[in-house]
């Protein structure tokens, strides 16, 4: 069985609710496994990290977990280097427009302002597993550099005790300072607490499996690090009408299924004809493009859906409830339809904007909130690595004019003896 078609309305809760709840899994069981690993790395440092690296990554741990990028000279295919440089340039140019201005305003004669200051040290997690992700290194490091972060390290699992030159090249092009060859919960713990050989970071970003996510959530809850949004399985929701190309829509669904067996791929449409054609194209593509076929088939079977609503308005209502990581809008009036979007990690407009463009080269960030977190989180960006510091310079005249209000408020809160007095003595 491939992808299923459902004719639905917004009140069909038995069909829609399980999809809306998708990967909001209870992390408690994973946290129970992760906590002792994290605490062990905290207490025993490199020694514990070596044991877990050999156990979970099934490699002989490297002699040194840390690679200083300035000392490395990776050898990669010129075409790969050109692509990485181009992607980095586009990412940098897009994220430059996110750099906020420090601002001032005068209120009642007082100067008030906002000062943006960077986090001092950041680790960017680049997943291991079934694929290599030099693009994630670019996506994590470049916004941090633009924000002014001075100390940036990559944390990623070793492959056969070392790292591919492609990952090292990406780190060098992006401007990272070092690479920490450690993955999973143990790697997150190492860069959070620091070890004998690994510097600690104040903030950790980047996608990973449920153990990485659980470690980030646990350490954040302990106040050890700050994190970006907790990551779940990759997902795409496509809203399309009969102007969309069914083969292209099918390809975009399968590009998400290619990430993993738990990836989510959903089409919402008002056209039963398009739905049927997309289903046929998905089945055809699974035969014609067999690479990672078992993974794609399981993803599509378990987490792939085609919903046929009576109109596009219902498609957008459902999408905003779902709050997808990636939202594609392949409709006749896609620019107008963008205004209907309330919750999404990143939006891809028109027939010529597949998610893969944002994954690699267009310049938007691919580190995005998943599992409905787009309702409250944004994509990774420059602001992720900045703190907003407010300041004020109060005049003597303002003290005199505003003290009566301070007196009333401090008395109401029962704090006039010291709060009120600190203003009163300055009149």
UniProtKB/Swiss-Prot annotation:
Zn(2+) binds at residues 256, 259, 359, 419. The keyword RNA-binding does not apply. GO terms for cellular component: cytoplasm; cytosol. Pathway: Amino-acid biosynthesis; L-histidine biosynthesis; L-histidine from 5-phospho-alpha-D-ribose 1-diphosphate: step 9/9. GO terms for biological process: L-histidine biosynthetic process. Substrate binds at residues 234, 256, 259, 326, 359, 413, 419. Its EC number is 1.1.1.23. It catalyses: L-histidinol + 2 NAD(+) + H2O = L-histidine + 2 NADH + 3 H(+). Binds 1 zinc ion per subunit. NAD(+) binds at residues 125, 186, 209. CDD domains: Histidinol_dh (cd06572). One of its GO terms (molecular function) is zinc ion binding. The keyword NAD applies. Catalyzes the sequential NAD-dependent oxidations of L-histidinol to L-histidinaldehyde and then to L-histidine. PANTHER family: HISTIDINE BIOSYNTHESIS TRIFUNCTIONAL PROTEIN (PTHR21256:SF2), HISTIDINOL DEHYDROGENASE HDH (PTHR21256). This is Histidinol dehydrogenase. It comes from Leptospira interrogans serogroup Icterohaemorrhagiae serovar Lai (strain 56601).
């Amino acid at each position: 069985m491939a992808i299923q078609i459902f004719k639905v309305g917004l009140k069909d809760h038995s069909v829609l609710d399980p999809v809306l709840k998708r990967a909001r899994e209870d992390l408690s069981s994973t946290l129970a496994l992760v906590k002792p690993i994290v605490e062990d790395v905290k207490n025993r440092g490199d020694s514990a990290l070596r044991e877990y690296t050999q156990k979970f990554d099934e490699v002989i741990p490297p002699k040194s977990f840390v690679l200083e990028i300035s000392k490395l000279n990776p050898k990669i295919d010129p075409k790969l280097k050109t692509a990485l440089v181009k992607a980095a340039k586009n990412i940098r140019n897009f994220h430059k427009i996110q750099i906020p201005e420090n601002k001032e305003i005068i209120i009642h004669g007082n100067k008030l302002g906002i000062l943006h200051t960077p986090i001092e040290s950041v680790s960017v997690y680049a997943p291991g597993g079934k694929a290599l992700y030099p693009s994630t290194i670019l996506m994590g490091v470049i916004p941090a550099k633009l924000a002014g972060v001075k100390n940036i390290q990559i944390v990623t699992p070793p492959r056969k005790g070392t790292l591919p030159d492609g990952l090292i090249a990406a780190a060098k092009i992006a401007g990272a300072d070092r690479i920490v060859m450690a993955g999973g919960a143990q790697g997150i713990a190492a860069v959070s607490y620091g070890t004998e050989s690994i510097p600690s970071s104040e903030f950790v970003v980047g996608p990973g499996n449920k153990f990485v996510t659980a470690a980030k959530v646990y350490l954040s809850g302990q106040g050890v690090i700050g994190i970006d949004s907790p990551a779940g399985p990759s997902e795409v929701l496509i809203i399309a009408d009969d102007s969309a190309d069914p083969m292209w829509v099918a390809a975009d669904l399968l590009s998400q299924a290619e990430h993993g067996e738990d990836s989510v791929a959903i089409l919402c449409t008002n056209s039963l004809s398009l739905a049927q054609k997309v289903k046929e194209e998905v089945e055809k593509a699974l035969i014609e493009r067999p690479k990672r076929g078992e993974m794609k088939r399981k993803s599509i079977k378990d987490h792939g859906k085609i919903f046929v609503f009576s109109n596009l308005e219902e498609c957008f209502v459902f999408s905003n409830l779902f709050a997808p990581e990636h939202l594609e809008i392949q409709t006749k009036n896609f620019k107008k339809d963008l205004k209907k979007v309330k919750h999404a990690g990143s939006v891809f407009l028109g027939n010529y904007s597949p998610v893969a463009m944002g994954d690699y080269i267009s310049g938007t960030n691919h580190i995005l909130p998943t599992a409905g977190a787009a309702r409250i989180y944004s994509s990774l960006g420059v602001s992720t690595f900045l703190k907003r510091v407010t300041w004020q310079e109060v005049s003597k005249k303002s003290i005199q004019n505003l003290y009566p209000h301070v007196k009333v408020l401090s008395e109401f809160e029962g704090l006039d003896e010291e709060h009120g007095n600190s203003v009163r003595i300055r009149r």
